[in-house]
Every structure is written in C-alpha cells, then in structure tokens.
Amino acid sequence: MSFISAAPKAFGRFWSAEACFRFQSGGLPPHSKFATSWLGAGKLPRYCRRFFDSKCSIWMFVLLLFTANASAQTNQSRSLVLVIGAAGEAEYGEQFSKCAGLWKEAAAKGGLQVTVIGEDKDKPDEDLRRLLEVVTNEVAKPAGELWLVFIGHGTYDGRSAKFNLRGPDITATNLAAALKPCRRPLVVVQCASASGPFLSALSAPGRVIITATRSGYELNATRFGNYLARAIADPAADLDKDGQTSLLEAFLAASREVQQFYKEQGRMLTEHALLDDNGDGLGTPPEWFRGTRAVKSAANGKSVDGIRAHQVFLVPGEQERQLSAEVRSSRDELEQKLSALRLKKKEIKEDDYFAQLEVILLEMAKLYDGK
C-alpha cells in the first residue's frame, strides 16, 4: 500500500477536530533524531514531507507509517457471547430479538464466533447454567477479544444487581467471579435497566465495560441497547472517519439517540449510560466527551476513559484488518502512552515534553520500519 493511497482514511483516526490527539506545536524540533533520521535522510516522500513543512499534526505521519508498513493480520479467535434475557412481555421480546439480530449481523461482518444464550425454547430454565459454562470455556482461551452483550431487563434490591434470565438470574457478583480468571481482552456491554452496579463489579485493567444506567436505581426499561445495536457497525457513527466504528463511537452515538428520544417525547431522562475502560470502576458519561476525546479529568489521577474503547472495533475497517495482532497491540500501547503524555503537557517543560514525545515516535517508527 502506498502512502498516498493510505492517506485519506489515515487522517481520520487522529485528525478530526477535537476527536484526535493533536500536538499543535507545529512539529518536532529540527535537531531531533526523529526529524533528522526521517526527514533529513529523505525517507519520506514529498507527500508526507509537506505535512511537516505546513506544520500539520505529527499524528498524520505516524498513522501513515502504520498503514504503509502493516503486515497481514494474525487471525486470533474473537468471540461474542450474546445473552438474551427474559422478555416478560411480547413487545420486549420482539425488541430483544431485533436487537440480537443486529449484533449477530455485525459479528458476522467482523468475523466473530457467536454463541447465543436465551433462544433455546426446549430448556429455558437452564440459561444461567449454560451462560456460566460458556463463559468458563471462553475465559480459558488464551487470546482474542471476548465480547459479552446482555440484552434484557435488570433489577436491583439495594444490595444486589441482577440481569433477568428465563430461569434463575445472574448477579453482578456471579458474573464477576466467572470472569475473574479472564486474561483475554474483554468487552462487556450490559444494556439492561439497573445495570450500573455491573460496571464497578466487572471493571479491571484491559477491560471495556458499558452499562445502560449509572446506578441500580434506574429501574425503568432502557432504550440504550436498541440504539447501540444499530450504531455498532453503522458508518454514520464513525466520528473520526477512519472507515470503522469504534465501541466508543457507538457508545456516543447511542447515548445521543437516547437523549434525543426522551427530549422529543417530553419525558424525563431515566437512563444514563456509562463507559469504563481505565479500570477505576467509576465510569464516564457521554457528556464528558467532545468528539472522541474526554475533555474532563478522571478522578484520582487515573487516565481518562475512552482511549481503549476507541481502539476496539466489532467490525474492523479494511486497514485495521491488515495489521497483525502484534503490531496492533504495540500501536495501542503507544497510543495510550501518547495520550498520557498529552495530559501532562501543561505540567512539564516544553523541551522535556518534546524529548518524551520523540522517544515514543521513534518507537513507532522502529515498529513499522522493522527495526
């Protein structure tokens, strides 16, 4: 793939206004190793050199390196466990079925192996047993993303939050225990009412947790799950125009739709979705984001939520599929380092900032130059 052919979609991930990690300094100092080794040595085509000459974002160049030198993707098994809860009423049953259908369709496009809990009409009372069995088997696998999506109703009695299955319900505590040994990248989407307590129970490093409500006391039936199912593979939700819709982008799109629904109906908003991907168990509401970047600081000095969720795609784009698992993992780690550095920009001296920035960018250059 040439730099020029890679460029249009490459810009999107880091270049859309207020949605990318832009370093607006105008480029690296001319004496830096990065500038002299790549710019001075003539390793950049004129197309890329123009970006530096015109003081465009360093990120443009970095991403062009990603796409131009990407190797074939290493196939790691990705799994989706889709849990359909007890409907209670026929109307909800139809909604849940439609929502599940959208997830299945998206998972097929993304190449995930799909297991569905809650559709077996012969043994409806065994949903809990089967769910725990499936989770145990999936947790034992060594690699590949694991997605758990819950579509249904939930309850909360002030002590325990539950997701309503057709037989015995599963509690947040039960699910947390089952997932404790998991070392795979994990995504849990809990679309039910009263789902807030699941976020704190399941939160841990390396996980992305989304709940339809911010507490167990938001007990009314939720609409967030319906909108999220529509957004998860919808190009219209792709805020940064990189050819794929991240989990963060889908979360933000669904949240906007929920707010619009209640506004048009003239009703009080009774559900407030949260996203947690930094492991602090607190969660971040959609209002904290401008574009795909959180504009408020996380508590206790933690990194802000949203960075990891913006690196997760149920349906990866064409360029994302070309990256090997190893390259993708290294890229994600470097992106997180850059984000952390960006947060400290006002606290450190400019020279120190550029020195640290240069180290990270050199790592990126070596990663894609095969050194």
Regions found by a protein language model. Give the residues of each.
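Glycine-biased, low-complexity coil/linker segments
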Residues: 7, 14, 18, 30, ...
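Disordered regulatory segments flanking catalytic cores
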Residues: 52-81, 93, 267-371
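Loop/turn elements at helix/coil->beta-strand transitions in domains of secreted/extracellular proteins
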Residues: 76-80, 110-113, 141-146, 182-187, ...
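Active-site-proximal beta-strand/loop segments in catalytic clefts of secreted hydrolases
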Residues: 83-87, 117-121, 149-153, 165-168, ...
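Functional beta-strand-loop-alpha-helix junction segments that form "active/interaction loops"
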Residues: 91, 102-144
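Active-site-proximal C-terminal subdomain of hydrolase catalytic domains
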Residues: 101, 187-286
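A short, glycine/acidic-enriched catalytic loop
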Residues: 151-182
